[in-house]
Amino acid sequence: MSSLFINDHPLVQSKLALLRDVKTNSKEFRELVGEMASLLCYDAVREFKTKTTEVETPFGTAEANVLEREIGVVALLRAGIGMAEGIQNMIPTAKIGHIGLYRDPNTLQPIEYFCKVPKDAENMHIFVLDPMLATGGTAAAAIQFLKERGVKDITFLCIVCGREGVQKIQAEHPDVDIYAAALDSAITEDGYIVPGLGDVGNRMYGTK
């Protein structure tokens, strides 16, 4: 079964408090989303394998360790975009892709309307990004789409998750670990996590 890792680092939790605060403006909110993604990514790659190489320093040659595999990022539109920028700041070589999904109003099944994944994604470790993991339907569908394209190694990063979403990922994708800053207690009928962060896309871009 996939594991849920809640990052309780004081810096992560301090930034989470600012994200939750309704008084935080859009500019600050966007910056915090990116910063939080960087911190979650830092935690998630802790156990990744490295390989040894040599680099030239100003005074000679040094043995160094670098990540063994390429890392790719797939942001779920639209709120995941802010997280992707944060991870690219941490790992500049990370390739960025996007998946857009909407729910069919009759069947409630997720429908893909946009999908652009990194070239050779099947050879990378892919981070799927969405600030909120509520019911888990969109996240689970996006992960399935990636697997159908040959991606084998996937980690899901979010800022806040709900139990329902975690359980769905664990049931449908037991090989996908989840990294988050908080596990909240409830989900509204409209699919919002409580207390949550509100509508992350709207708060990031100042829309309603």
Kindly label every feature range from the protein language model.
Residues M1-K208:
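PRPP-associated nucleotide enzymes
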